[in-house]
């Protein structure tokens, strides 16, 4: 879910948005009971949004909404998380917060597969990069193998990187 494509008039609280991802456990058309509150609270704490649990989702900034959507994914305690452009449409401060959060989640043992065109943020938050360019797959590298300038050169097609 992307914050910039979310209907901000949707009348749901932050807690309800996160808890909605638990319907597979509770059963379709059943209310998410209080027994799931600890899971929801933990997910919101992981993304720094616990204090907003009773706020309507539409009252939050784009960066805050994006953190809520990450909490929604985390509520099921995944081992693998796919993220498509998690920083699109949010301000620079929120981008830094989201990428820092992603880095922390990765350090906690969650494997994160992410598409992103924000090269500096991507290099900062990643420990491995699979670089695709206009001409296709370029290289799979660890962050330590390349500088940000080298990654930018690969993206621009000015350089090809190959491991021996």
Language-model region placement:
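Conserved ABC ATPase "signature" region
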Residues: 19, 34-52
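Conserved ABC ATPase signature
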Residues: 56-60
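Conserved catalytic motifs of ABC-family nucleotide-binding domains
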Residues: 77
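Catalytic Walker B motif of ABC-type/P-loop ATPase nucleotide-binding domains
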Residues: 81-84
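Helix N-cap at the start of a conserved alpha-helix in ABC-type nucleotide-binding domains
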Residues: 92-94
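H-loop/switch region of ABC-family ATPase nucleotide-binding domains
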Residues: 116-117
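H-loop (His-switch) and adjacent beta-strand-loop-beta switch element
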Residues: 129-142
